[in-house]
Design a protein with these regions (language model features):
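Conserved catalytic-core motifs of eukaryotic protein kinase domains, centered on the activation segment
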Residues: 116-117, 148
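A short glycine-rich, Lys/Arg-flanked "PGG" loop and its adjoining helix->strand segment in the class I
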Residues: 119-134
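Short alpha-helix
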Residues: 159-175
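Conserved S-adenosyl-L-methionine
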Residues: 176-181
Length: 181
């Protein structure tokens, strides 16, 4: 897929940068305690796209890094002055030291990955998180009839829907203490 296609697609069908930032702000309260415990802790955002979440983290004084493979998305993130790298999510995680991150986030990336890659992502995330660290994955909810029958398939890069019970089971199976969907 050309580097300009997916960026144009996202801008037309996902929402403006401002709208996405408004939606993602929901997750900030989950990080408050971690920021207090680890004031210099780093959050990595895989599949960072245009960097909306990274902007929110910057605005809240949270050290971060974004990782993506799409040149068009990375170009926008770099234009915004964000700290991003072009790298596969597993390569990134494998390059991180044990207990080096306070959180790993991935908004609308899980549904793009083969399930085996998602399993490895969860396993590696547990290794790189500091005690009490968080894994936050947001994905379209196929239990919503409109999402499960139509809008999920609008994105040609989606592999398969991930039902909430499956997404909740995955981190528990690989050693996380709890999971919430």
């Amino acid at each position: 897929m050309g580097s300009s296609f997916y960026r144009s697609f996202e801008e037309r069908h996902r929402g403006s940068v401002e709208e996405i930032k408004r939606r993602l702000s929901f997750y900030l309260p989950f990080l408050a305690g971690l920021k207090d415990i680890y004031p210099d802790g780093v959050i990595a955002d895989i599949g960072c796209g245009r960097g909306e979440w990274l902007e929110i983290l910057n605005e809240n004084g949270i050290v971060n890094i974004g990782v993506d493979l799409d040149d068009g998305m990375l170009a926008r993130a770099r234009e915004a002055g964000l700290n991003v790298q072009k790298m596969d999510c597993l390569q990134f995680l494998q390059s991180q030291a044990d207990q080096s991150l306070i959180a790993l986030t991935g908004f609308h990336i899980a549904e793009h990955l083969p399930f085996e890659v998602l399993q490895q992502l969860v396993m590696h995330t547990l290794r790189v998180l500091k005690p009490g660290g968080l894994l936050i994955l947001e994905t379209p909810n196929p239990e919503n009839v409109s999402v499960g029958t139509c809008s999920f398939y609008m994105d040609p890069t989606h592999n398969h829907p991930l039902p909430p019970p499956l997404l909740e089971f995955l981190p528990i199976h690989y050693g996380f203490n709890r999971a919430i969907t």
